Amino acid sequence: MSLKEGAHTKWGVLKQKLGPQDPEQIEGNMENADPELCIRLLQIPSVVNYSGLKKRLESSDDDWMVQFLELSGLDLLLEALDRLSGRGVARIADALLQLTCINCVRTLMNSHRGIEYIVNNEGYVRKLSQALDTSNVMVKKQVFELLAALCIYSPEGHALSLDALEHYKAVKNQQYRFSVIMNELSTSDNVPYMVTLLSAINAIIFGTEELRKRVQLRNEFIGLQLLDLLTKLRDLEDEDLLIQAIVFEEAKSEDEEELLKIYGGIDMNNHQEVFSTLFNKVSCSPLSVQLLSVLQGLLHLDQSHPSSPLLWEALDILVNRAVLLADDCQNNNVEEVMDRLVTSKKHPSKEKRKPDKCTNQVNKSIQTDKPKDESCEEKTVKKDPVSSGIPADSLQLSDALLALPACVSPLHTPLSGDITSPSHFPSPPSPVVSNAIDRISTSSSLPPPLPPPLPGTELSLPPPPPPPLPGMGGISLTPPPPPPLPGMGGMLPPPPPPLPGMGGMLPPPPPPLPGMGGMLPPPPPPLPGMGGMLPPPPPPLPGMGGMPPPPPPLPGMGGMPPPPPPMFGMGTFTDEVVVARVDYSLGYLPKAYFKVNKPTLKMKKLNWQKLPPNVINDTHSMWASASSSNDTPEPNYSSIEQLFCLPQAVAKEPAAPVKKPPKEISFLDSKKNLNLNIFLKQFKCPNEEVIQLIEKGDRSRFDIEILKQFLKLLPEKHEVENLKSYQEDKAKLSNADQFYLLLLGIPCYQLRIECMLICEEVNLMTDVLRPKAKVVSSACDDIISSHRLPLFCQLILKVGNFLNYGSHTGNANGFKIGTLLKLTETKANQNRITLLHHILEEIEQNHTDLLQLPSDLENVSTAAGINIENMYSETSGNLKKLRDLQNKISTAATDVKDQYEKSIQECMDALKEVEEQLTDITQKKVKLADYLCEDSAKLSLEETFSTMKAFRDLFLKAKKDNKDRKEQAVKAEKRKKQLADEEAKRQKGENGKIIRKGAAKLEEGCIIDALLADIKKGFQLRKTAKTKTEADSCPKPVSSETTGTDGTDVKHVDHVGILPQIKLDSSLNLDGTEQHKSKSKDNCGENFDNKPVVIAPINLDTSACLMNISEQNAKLPVSALQEGANLKQNPDTFVKEQSAIVTTESSTHNNIDGSSVDKCTLGQSQWPSEISDEVDSKYHEMPMQVEHKERAVEGKCSLPKPSVLGTESSSNQNNALNEGSQQHHNNTANESLQQAQNSALSEASQQSCCHTGIKGSPQFQSSALNADSQPSHTSVVGSAQAQRNELDDVALQTRDTTVTEGSQVEEDKCNDEGYPEHKTMGEHPLNSSSHSTTLQQSSEDGQKVKRGSSKHKKKRRSSKHGEEDGVDSPTHKTRGCVVQ
């Protein structure tokens, strides 16, 4: 114990000296850090910094988040993640660092500002996808989750995710964009990671609303063997995996059904069915020739070729374009159609950076590394000057020089006569970048010469003169042409003049002799080390015309003696063959400067680097000056020769000759001799014993293979003659020859071996054929004698006649046995259920005995692998061999006859028994053919048994599938019940009030987490992606299905929701936004005098709710349409003027007529409490207004389930809303509901005010009738599938009654002023068409709706009751109403 205490004490002291290591304390330093400090800390990647940043991001507000993003915080995170992924995970610390970094990215994307910033800026998702290039499974899991959430978040996010996968495919040089997902799914054994991958697949598919796009994405995964992987994943029996698999299969089934409806019953995912339909479509027309040609061309495409996927993709694009052009190219010819198919609009930037072919090749020195199969454009991306380390001006000059050949045409002046091969004329090498830098260094004194020619150029043009030298300012020369392009033969490269200080290059030759006339000079000799190439030609003869002579070499360059002058009378340059002058750098050494002594012995070599002679010619060099002096020391050559000579090899004395043993004599060739010796060694006995075994007929040491090999090694005729003629010593013969001599001593040795072989073969064959024949015979009997098979076939016959009723295949009396294999091809409407599955379910319920059918076919399944035809052929062939041997034995020696006659007869008897069994099988085959109604001559037992075996396997598999499906259904039901229990527990708080979920979670800053939770639960059976989040999406336009014949909306409903009760102190104004500008165009200034008013909720997940307005006394203070008209005329002043204060009583909840409602219940669904909680506004709401709104939603009332909601004729739509009420009516909470309703409605009737009620409540209906108010036809039509709200908090209040409607707006601004009275209204009628137009316009503008600030959200959450009061269930989301 003392040692342990001492260790603990030392450890404590060490921790105190090292300082506090608690990460919580360190991370706490960033709790109040500003974005600048966080950016600086991010530049030092560490787990502590990332963890602290994660906490800071979770607690940050919108302003802080925006500033952090503007300071490139996200760029730093993604760059660090990319670098961490690129260097691998060699340590646990690296893996933890990666994980904390990706957690910061996820926290950033959890906020509305962060995910919108990523979606609106391309490149971030690509950078995120590069983090998949790591071995850290947890990091890849997080990346796939983020990509999946982006797919569901918005269409833009879905497109960016697909683009990121496409980018990753190009970076990793993969063949398909989804290969990374499928490779991970097929190789991983981590179940949570596999769940993430499968959910990512579902998110990619569900992320698009277009059916064809969904099918295309799903088929891409299916083409990568996803269906096979799903079968393996189901065997893991993980609940989350099963959810994702079920979601995938159900969505696939639904899409296939929808495709079947669209294409008239054609399975567009079945290649054979599509081809058959296409063939039947064009088979009787001339188009069949083109179809055949297209198919023949496609058949020639090799799918294993690397370019095959690109070709197929290009063909797919062309076909899609052809479909689009089908109705638009009637008057065009083939050429015009091809131009329209092939021509595509390209991005201007791509065309600008599309390089010329020659420029492409020249730029190789500054290319970045790309995969080999990438396009030409991608290979010409130049490196950044800062990262490459090359000065920017150097690269610019190099680029200008490299681009010169593309824009200047070379001068073509071909020479006549014979010219030596261009390979004999070397081109002066000069690297591009190095020359550019060298030219920059000397640009002040010498203009840069042209770059050298590229390899492969040919000679046909004299070089142009070099640029003028310093001091030749009066000479004006035109720019020389550029060097020839690669592959453009017939041009001589121009020689660039050497720059000062270029050590390895010879100066150009001096000017020609007087009278030469200035012929072009030859190019300078190449650099040293360019062996194998002849130097340039000598200068031309005097008197040759041409261009002016070149200038002399630069001063200080020295010079070597000029080349020898050419012979006079040589003729013109073009009439003779150019002869190259000798260059010392190519192996022709000049005369040595000093004498070298020759050693007498072979010496060891000194490994040095030899200078070329042309370098030493300079008089200023060390070697030239040293060689000219006489003081050079002389070495002691004799001592050097003794010390550094190679050792001399001493001649060995010839060894005494060894007597070789006498060579063996053999009459066999070497190969046969070797094979026979190998054969004899396996017996491991002397040759005499082997001969005795053969003579006695003992087969114990011989098997079939040995005997077959022995027959091949028997001596041939000439070998037998040679061995018999040998009369010398037998011991001199080889072992194989001696064995042959012993074998020749046995009479009829070959017949003996053949008899041994046939007996072995027959015995083995009969042992194999007897059980096979028995199995085949039993299989035939089992099929005929089975009583379950006919019953099963009768059941299938009845089902088939039912399915094929009315067609040419119906009313059948029987079917061929091969039909049993097609039961699985008929698929049910439900997923993974075929006709065979259903028939087995029927059997399990009503005919359980038929489930034992596979046991009747067990022998048939065994017989399926037997080749019966081979049995016949083997038996007949061996019988023939036995008869032949029997004839040979009858004429052989007596001992052979006595030895093998009995054995041969026994073999024949065994084969005859097998032959009898086969004959019996033939007879049973005829019976089986009659039993199955088949042709006995064409019936193949092998095919029949194979069909029955395949059917038996399908039977057992379908039986197992049914069992597994039932078990999975039980588990799913149990899981569903568990989730429902958890939902029920979470729905209510301590005081029984409803707690918000779903969209509220998104508002609280957990967008990614909410989306992933939705994905994990199976997307809540959603198939289409929602635009943005639930708060940002827009309602869909009203379809024609919900519109009546008279233009009014007619909707059948299933259930109703609770309408929030809001008591207004005064009229409620509608704040104008951009969305209402579009609405006011059709709806502004309308009167509703004696006409029914239709109030249609834009997005109600409840089916419908009704609201009645008295036709005679409906006088509302203002309508939303009037405010829309004012907004259209002057939106700015309208927003400032219009306001209202929403007030409620804290103790009681007032219903429509002002009476208190203690509690109202509704059986099916409830509306959300806060209508405007998810809608952002440019203007901040007042705190009192927020409180009033939260209180106003507590009132609830019961609504019945109406049958059909309709509208009356529109003849009374004038002056329905004329003036505002000036009074407010509030009843106390102690009055009963019935009394409050009767009194309120009676008072409202006497005062000729608008009476509004909600259908379905008997109290409301009776009170309304007693008050002599005509029933209204106002309808509140709910859209059960709508996602979003269009308007927010539009409340229409009368003196005694209140109409509340939620409207989605961007601005919720209210004050204490009342609504102005007696607004003038327009004359435009409001009908369903305008409503449809409004919804469509609102759908377009809905993308612009933004969320409210976090300040408002906090105020809403800090309401009086301390919790949210409404339910925002995924199936009941009420957002607002539109007055029609």
Swiss-Prot record:
<feature type="compositionally biased region" description="Basic residues">
    <location>
        <begin position="1345"/>
        <end position="1359"/>
    </location>
</feature>
<protein>
    <recommendedName>
        <fullName>Inverted formin-2</fullName>
    </recommendedName>
</protein>
<dbReference type="Pfam" id="PF06367">
    <property type="entry name" value="Drf_FH3"/>
</dbReference>
<feature type="domain" description="FH2">
    <location>
        <begin position="593"/>
        <end position="981"/>
    </location>
</feature>
<feature type="coiled-coil region">
    <location>
        <begin position="956"/>
        <end position="991"/>
    </location>
</feature>
<feature type="domain" description="FH1">
    <location>
        <begin position="432"/>
        <end position="592"/>
    </location>
</feature>
<dbReference type="Pfam" id="PF06371">
    <property type="entry name" value="Drf_GBD"/>
</dbReference>
<dbReference type="InterPro" id="IPR014768">
    <property type="entry name" value="GBD/FH3_dom"/>
</dbReference>
<feature type="region of interest" description="Disordered">
    <location>
        <begin position="341"/>
        <end position="391"/>
    </location>
</feature>
<feature type="compositionally biased region" description="Basic and acidic residues">
    <location>
        <begin position="367"/>
        <end position="385"/>
    </location>
</feature>
<comment type="similarity">
    <text>Belongs to the formin homology family.</text>
</comment>
<feature type="compositionally biased region" description="Pro residues">
    <location>
        <begin position="446"/>
        <end position="470"/>
    </location>
</feature>
<feature type="compositionally biased region" description="Polar residues">
    <location>
        <begin position="1206"/>
        <end position="1244"/>
    </location>
</feature>
<feature type="compositionally biased region" description="Low complexity">
    <location>
        <begin position="1328"/>
        <end position="1339"/>
    </location>
</feature>
<dbReference type="GO" id="GO:0030036">
    <property type="term" value="P:actin cytoskeleton organization"/>
</dbReference>
<feature type="region of interest" description="Disordered">
    <location>
        <begin position="1260"/>
        <end position="1380"/>
    </location>
</feature>
<dbReference type="InterPro" id="IPR010473">
    <property type="entry name" value="GTPase-bd"/>
</dbReference>
<dbReference type="InterPro" id="IPR003124">
    <property type="entry name" value="WH2_dom"/>
</dbReference>
<dbReference type="InterPro" id="IPR010472">
    <property type="entry name" value="FH3_dom"/>
</dbReference>
<feature type="region of interest" description="Disordered">
    <location>
        <begin position="1026"/>
        <end position="1049"/>
    </location>
</feature>
<dbReference type="Pfam" id="PF02181">
    <property type="entry name" value="FH2"/>
</dbReference>
<feature type="compositionally biased region" description="Polar residues">
    <location>
        <begin position="1294"/>
        <end position="1303"/>
    </location>
</feature>
<dbReference type="InterPro" id="IPR015425">
    <property type="entry name" value="FH2_Formin"/>
</dbReference>
<feature type="compositionally biased region" description="Basic and acidic residues">
    <location>
        <begin position="1306"/>
        <end position="1322"/>
    </location>
</feature>
<dbReference type="InterPro" id="IPR042201">
    <property type="entry name" value="FH2_Formin_sf"/>
</dbReference>
<feature type="compositionally biased region" description="Polar residues">
    <location>
        <begin position="1260"/>
        <end position="1284"/>
    </location>
</feature>
<feature type="domain" description="GBD/FH3">
    <location>
        <begin position="1"/>
        <end position="330"/>
    </location>
</feature>
<feature type="compositionally biased region" description="Pro residues">
    <location>
        <begin position="478"/>
        <end position="541"/>
    </location>
</feature>
<dbReference type="GO" id="GO:0031267">
    <property type="term" value="F:small GTPase binding"/>
</dbReference>
<keyword id="KW-0175">Coiled coil</keyword>
<dbReference type="InterPro" id="IPR011989">
    <property type="entry name" value="ARM-like"/>
</dbReference>
<keyword id="KW-0009">Actin-binding</keyword>
<feature type="region of interest" description="Disordered">
    <location>
        <begin position="1188"/>
        <end position="1244"/>
    </location>
</feature>
<dbReference type="GO" id="GO:0003779">
    <property type="term" value="F:actin binding"/>
</dbReference>
<feature type="compositionally biased region" description="Basic residues">
    <location>
        <begin position="343"/>
        <end position="352"/>
    </location>
</feature>
<feature type="region of interest" description="Disordered">
    <location>
        <begin position="440"/>
        <end position="541"/>
    </location>
</feature>
<feature type="domain" description="WH2">
    <location>
        <begin position="1009"/>
        <end position="1024"/>
    </location>
</feature>
<dbReference type="InterPro" id="IPR016024">
    <property type="entry name" value="ARM-type_fold"/>
</dbReference>
<feature type="coiled-coil region">
    <location>
        <begin position="879"/>
        <end position="930"/>
    </location>
</feature>
